[in-house]
C-alpha cells in the first residue's frame, strides 16, 4: 500500500510537524496488544449481534434501520481495530458496511442512506474510508471521495452546514486534506476553505471564552463532544492558511480556556452533556474522551508541541480505561473523578439522565455505544509520526512496533516497554539496509525533564534536561537500541475543590474501593449494572506523608480492580464527616481537616483500574 505520509511535491498545504503514518504502519505490542485483543472479544467485536443499530438492519449496510451517525461511528473504531489486529472476523464485520457505502454513490456524488441527507454522518464515513484505503490500498476510495467532495463544494452554498455538521466541520476538512495529498485536485482547497467558514469559529470563541462556569442551557458551543472535536480546528485551518503561529496561539487559548474552567484530575474536561466545571463529581462523557484523544493527536502532529503528548497519555491511560468494564463489554455514558456509587440516580447539576453513571450497553444516549470503539485503536495508530526532516518521532509511549520506509529504506522499530506502569522504554531500530542515516525524535515528558536519561547502543547515558524533543541522528544498524529512562516522582496536585490528587508520570492515582457489581436489568454480557462500594471510601491523605512505589507483573488486563501492576502506598485517615451528597460525594472537606480516626496505610491505584474511587481527597493532619 503506498505510504503518503511524506509531503507531496508542490502541495499547497503547510507541512505538519509530524505526519500521520498510514493505518497499519504502527501496530500494538505487549499489554497494548492485549488491550486491543480484549476490545475485539468484547463489545466492539460483537456490537451488531446485540444492538440492531449497528447490525444487519443498519441503513449504512442497506438495511431499514438507523440511518444517521451510529453506523459511521462504529466503523470509525471497528475498521482501525480490525486492521491493527489483522483480525479476519472483524474485517468480515466491517466489509458489508464498506461495500454498501461504496456502492451507494449517486451520479451527482452524494452517497449514503436516502432517508438521511445530513452532512455530519458523512464526515465520519469519509474518515472511515480514508483509514480503509490506507490499510488496504482500495483503489475505489479516492474516486468515490472526489465525486462526493465535488458534490459537496457545489451544494454547500445552497445547503450549508447546520447543527452538528457546523460544529464539527474540521473533521470534514481532514478527509479533504487526505484526498488532496493523494490527488492534488485544486478544487479540494476551495472546499477546505469553505467548510470552516460555514462552521462555528471556535478560536474566536476561545479567545474571549464566555462559558467558564458549569453550563445549564443547551447550545452547540457548550456541548462537551462538540468541544472535544473542535480542539483540532486550529490545526485544520493553519495547514491551508499557513498562519501556523497564529493558529498555535488559538490552540493554546482553547486548551487554556477549556481545561482551566472545566479540567479534571484524570486529564479530561467535564461535560455531562454540557461543559460542567471542575468539581470531581461532575460527569465526563465517554464520547468526549475518545474524540479529545483524536483531536489532540491531530494537534500534536500539526504543531509538534511535545506537551500535547503528555496530555494525550494522561487521558489515554486514565480516563479511557475507566469508562468501560475491564472486559470492555459495558461502558458508562459519564464517569466521575470521585465516583463512589454508580447507580441509576439523577446527579445534582447533570443534564444527563439517571442511568448515565451506570455500566451497560446503552446507559444513556446511544452515541457512546457506537463511538467508544475508536479510543484505543486511534491512540495506537498515532503513537509514532514522520518528522519534516524525514525521520521518525515517538509521539506517545506504549508497547508497539513500526514498519515504514525512511529515506527510501524499509525500517522496523520495536518499542518494548510496560510503560506507563514502568519507567523504561527500549526502542530497537532495524533498518533493512545497515547504515541508513535518519533522525529519531523522542518526546521528553514534562515529568521526566531533568531526571530522565537516554542511552544509545550502549554508549554513555545522555541526560534529558528539558521537556520537549530529544533528537538522535545517526547511521542506524540492525539491532541498535535506544533505552529511555523516564523516572517520575509521585506528586500531589491541589485541585479547585480544595482536595488533592496524586499523579506519577502519566498515571493519576485514586483510592480504589472494593467493588460490588449488581445486575439491574438485561442479560449478560450486555446487562446494565450498578456498582457500589464494598468498603469505606471517605479517606484523607496525611499531610506530608510520602509514597512507596509498589510493583507487580503486568497482567493481560492491567485496568481490572485488584490487578494494578503499579500502586502507591501512603498514610491516610478516615474522615467520618465526609459523606454523600445524594449519590455522589460531597466536596472534600476544606483543610485543615481534623479527624480522630487512626492513621492507616492505604494504597492508591491507577485511576483507570478503579470503578469505585476517590481521586480528589482532603489532606488530614497526621
PLM segments and residue spans:
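Solvent-exposed beta-strand/loop surfaces of large extracellular or lumenal domains
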Residues: 449-475, 492-497
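C-terminal beta-rich recognition modules with glycine/proline-rich loops and embedded aromatic residues
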Residues: 251, 310-318, 323-422, 428-431, ...
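Low-complexity, Ser/Thr/Pro/Gly-enriched N-terminal "stalk/linker" regions
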Residues: 2-70, 88-110, 139
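Extended ligand-binding groove/face enriched in aromatic
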Residues: 60-64, 72, 81-209
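Catalytic-core region of carbohydrate-active enzymes that cleave or remodel glycosidic bonds
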Residues: 236-261, 280-328, 339-340
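Beta-strand-rich binding/interaction modules
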Residues: 435-456
Amino acid at each position: 500500500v503506498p505510504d503518503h505520509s511524506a509531503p507531496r511535491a508542490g502541495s499547497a498545504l503547510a507541512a505538519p510537524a509530524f505526519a500521520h503514518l498510514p493505518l497499519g504502519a504502527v501496530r500494538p505490542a505487549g499489554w497494548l496488544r492485549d488491550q486491543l485483543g480484549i476490545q475485539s472479544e468484547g463489545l466492539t467485536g460483537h456490537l451488531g449481534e446485540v444492538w440492531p443499530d449497528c447490525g444487519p438492519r443498519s441503513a449504512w449496510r442497506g438495511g431499514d434501520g438507523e440511518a444517521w451517525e451510529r453506523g459511521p461511528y462504529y466503523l470509525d473504531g471497528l475498521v482501525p481495530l480490525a486492521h491493527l489486529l489483522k483480525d479476519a472476523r472483524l474485517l468480515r464485520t466491517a466489509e458489508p458496511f464498506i461495500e454498501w457505502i461504496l456502492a451507494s454513490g449517486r451520479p451527482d456524488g452524494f452517497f449514503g442512506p436516502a432517508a438521511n441527507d445530513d452532512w455530519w454522518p458523512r464526515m465520519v464515513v469519509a474518515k472511515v474510508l480514508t483509514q480503509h484505503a490506507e490499510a488496504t490500498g482500495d483503489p475505489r476510495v479516492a474516486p468515490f471521495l472526489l465525486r462526493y467532495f465535488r458534490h459537496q463544494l457545489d451544494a454547500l452554498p445552497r445547503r450549508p452546514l447546520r447543527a452538528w455538521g457546523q460544529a464539527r466541520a474540521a473533521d470534514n476538512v481532514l478527509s479533504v486534506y487526505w484526498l488532496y495529498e493523494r490527488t492534488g485536485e485544486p478544487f479540494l482547497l476551495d472546499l477546505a476553505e469553505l467548510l470552516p467558514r460555514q462552521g462555528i469559529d471556535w478560536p474566536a470563541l476561545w479567545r474571549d471564552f464566555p462559558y467558564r462556569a458549569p453550563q445549564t442551557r443547551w447550545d452547540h458551543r457548550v456541548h462537551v463532544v462538540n468541544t472535544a472535536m473542535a480542539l483540532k480546528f486550529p490545526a485544520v485551518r493553519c495547514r491551508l492558511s499557513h498562519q501556523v503561529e497564529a493558529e498555535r496561539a488559538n490552540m493554546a487559548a482553547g486548551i487554556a480556556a477549556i481545561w482551566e474552567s472545566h479540567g479534571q484530575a484524570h486529564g479530561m474536561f467535564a461535560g455531562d452533556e454540557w461543559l460542567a466545571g471542575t468539581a470531581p463529581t461532575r460527569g465526563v462523557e465517554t464520547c468526549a474522551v475518545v474524540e479529545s484523544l483524536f483531536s489532540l493527536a491531530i494537534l500534536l502532529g500539526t504543531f509538534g508541541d511535545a506537551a500535547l503528548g503528555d496530555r494525550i497519555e494522561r487521558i489515554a491511560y486514565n480516563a479511557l480505561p475507566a469508562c468501560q468494564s475491564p472486559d470492555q463489554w459495558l461502558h458508562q455514558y459519564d464517569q466521575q473523578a470521585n465516583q463512589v456509587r454508580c447507580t441509576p440516580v439523577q446527579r445534582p447539576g447533570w443534564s444527563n439522565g439517571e442511568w448515565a453513571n451506570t455500566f451497560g450497553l446503552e446507559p444513556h444516549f446511544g452515541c457512546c455505544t457506537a463511538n467508544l470503539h475508536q479510543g484505543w485503536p486511534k491512540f495506537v495508530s498515532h503513537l509514532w509520526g514522520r518528522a519534516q526532516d524525514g525521520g521518525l518521532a515517538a509521539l506517545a509511549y506504549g508497547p508497539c512496533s513500526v514498519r515504514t520506509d525512511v529515506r527510501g529504506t524499509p525500517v522496523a522499530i520495536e518499542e518494548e516497554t510496560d510503560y506507563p506502569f514502568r519507567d523504561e522504554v527500549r526502542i530497537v531500530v532495524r533498518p533493512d539496509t545497515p547504515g541508513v542515516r535518519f533522525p529519531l525524535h523522542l518526546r521528553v515528558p514534562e515529568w521526566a525533564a531533568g531526571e530522565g536519561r537516554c542511552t544509545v547502543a550502549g554508549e554513555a547515558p545522555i541526560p534529558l534536561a528539558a521537556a520537549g524533543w530529544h533528537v538522535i541522528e545517526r547511521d542506524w544498524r540492525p539491532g541498535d537500541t535506544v533505552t529511555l529512562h523516564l523516572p517520575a516522582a509521585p506528586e500531589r496536585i491541589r485541585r479547585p475543590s480544595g482536595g488533592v490528587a496524586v499523579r506519577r508520570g502519566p498515571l493519576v492515582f485514586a483510592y480504589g474501593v472494593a467493588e460490588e457489581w449488581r445486575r439491574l436489568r438485561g442479560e449478560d454480557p450486555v446487562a446494565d449494572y450498578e456498582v457500589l462500594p464494598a468498603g469505606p471510601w471517605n479517606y484523607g491523605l496525611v499531610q506530608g506523608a510520602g509514597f512507596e512505589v509498589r510493583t507487580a507483573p503486568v497482567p493481560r488486563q492491567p485496568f481490572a480492580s485488584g490487578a494494578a501492576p503499579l500502586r502507591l502506598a501512603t498514610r491516610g485517615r478516615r474522615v467520618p464527616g465526609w459523606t454523600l451528597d445524594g449519590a455522589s460525594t460531597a466536596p472534600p472537606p476544606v483543610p485543615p481537616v481534623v479527624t480522630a480516626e487512626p492513621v492507616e496505610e492505604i494504597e492508591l491505584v491507577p485511576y483507570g483500574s478503579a470503578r469505585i474511587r476517590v481521586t480528589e481527597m482532603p489532606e488530614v493532619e497526621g
